[in-house]
């Protein structure tokens, strides 16, 4: 399975990158391919472009604030292939987030 994700927290420091690490670790454990864009204190890193979103089976937005380019995910949202969660939930229990995401497929 191919997943794209964006992480962003209110301050853009710790939780943004902790959520990224949790998503990548859980994805690897399950044998999934994931690309995680971070929108934090360093700006946008590892940007997910429209082609990446279109090619993905599903998208996860682990965000606590508005993000740049959220319209990239409109089609995933409309087709029910988008999971939006709080970054702290990803950090606390990434397994549960992936279980929830798998139900969208």
Residue ranges and their predicted role:
Residues 40, 45-46, 62-68, 84:
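Metallocofactor- and cofactor-centric catalytic cores in central/energy metabolism, strongly enriched
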Residues 50-69, 73:
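Short, structured active-site "lid" loops
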Residues 19-24, 76-78, 99-100:
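Short, solvent-exposed amphipathic alpha-helical segments in soluble enzyme
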